[in-house]
Amino acid sequence: MTDGYYGGTSPSVGNVDGDNGAPYADGYSDTLADVAMEYYENDLASGLDDLVPTTDTDTATHQHMVTYSVSFGVYGTLNPDDYDIENGPYPTWPNPGSGDQQKIDDLWHAAVNGRGTFLSASRPDDLVNSLLSIMQHIESRIASASAVSVNGDELYEKLGADILMFQASYNSDGWTGDVKAYGIDTETGQVITTSYQWSAADELETTNWDTGRIIATYTGSAGIPFRYSSLTSTQQNQLNADPTTAQNILNFLRGDASNEESNGGPFRDRYWRLGDLVHSSPVFVNGVLYTGGNDGMLHAFSASDGSELFAYVPNLVFENLSQLADTEYTHKYYVDLTPTVKYVSSLDKTILVGGLAKGGRGYYALDVSNATSITSETALAGKVLWEYGGDDDLGYTFSKPVIVESYDSSVGAIVIFGNGYSSVNENAVLYILNPWTGAVIKKIDTGVGSCNGLSSPVAVDVDYDQIVDYVYAGDLKGNMWKFDLTASSSGSWDVAYKSGGTPKPVFQAKGPGGAIQSITTKPDVMRHCEKDGYIVVFATGSYLGETDVSDTSTQTIYGIWDY
């Protein structure tokens, strides 16, 4: 803060901004604007990683000074209202040494070079408001930083001669996402975080939204290219009743920015195309990374360079897709579950099965046996196997599927998952489907309901023959269930323990005072090290809704012996 009429000695920094172009450059040395540029351009803490969050106007990631200036009600020869620092016209900066008013212009110039703001306050209340404005600007930068969150665990995979770490993230300021690949220091074994090898979001931005992307969807009976002319009439109307608007929304979803507000259109602005990746962590199989996004798509990225190989839009999320283009968009979930990708030996196929988590009630499956060879939308459409939804026993599909071989030779491989939460019937139910057709082989209903649902299962192979014997899964009522799949006929698969014909859990988790402790995560199972049976390890707790945030009830980690 100053009256602007500085009279100090020269800072001797030179003409630091002289080579920066408009609106930063001038022809004068040792000005206040030069000082601001000196501490903006140079790393003020070179020993730290360059991870400073960026904004639209400040793209520097190194540690730097941002300059905010407030003059005490005095003005220079330039009127800031006559110029647009971001888009032009730009000011021609005068020589600060030629007069006091020119020094005020230099004060504004310093704020421009330092990517801050310039304010003038002629009264005490103006000064207070100016300081509040600066604080709000700083807080918005901090909020932008805190909005960036890492999704899931770090994924380490060997790619050729190198080991890479893949990490997904999302930014709640604009709801965008990214997957980045980082190298590993061969001497220290540490992740090299100062730079990344590729960014999927960056790669997608350079891809032509129309001709460069391979995207498919599903009609309810077959895969189709994600093109307006290929959609069913129902899908077209779900986008919009007006064909032109529906076509434009589909183009927007593919990545067309021409109809965004900043370009004079009716759709919301996006920082970039790739949507937020909140709960769906990347899965690496055969050089490909698969992850679900809340842009309505499952994405397949090349692990070598981050380019998108293809994307899939489940028909299950179609009814809400148009909301992604709404200028009043509030965040929604779409393809939010980590997919399962497994080579199925009995089919000689690699199958991907994914769910929606908070995005809806349903699962989908793709044949990804030769994912890197899919070069057209028609070819991708032919790899869509099935979608499953519309079942009153099926809730929001939080349960991560398991693909295993079974003892029923007429059935072969199976997909197993819990029914999730908030189903119409509200019981805890185990689903067993055919991985190639999506047909229901068996539903095992525990009979325990009233706002219940079965969480992610774990399959146990007791004799190492690559065939599932038992399945464990918890529910919202704190029950840990065991399912017996050892019979050679799927019709005999059932809950392992019963009393008088009524299914009984292995254990029920209860806290102090008998309060039920929900089980929402997959258990781990290991052999007892000295005796028969298995130790089932799991933790309780729920983080599914707003009430869970403030819930302070006691939760517990259990290890139970099932023998």
Regions found by a protein language model. Give the residues of each.
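A fold-level detector for beta-propeller and closely related beta-sheet-rich head/sensor domains
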Residues: 1-563
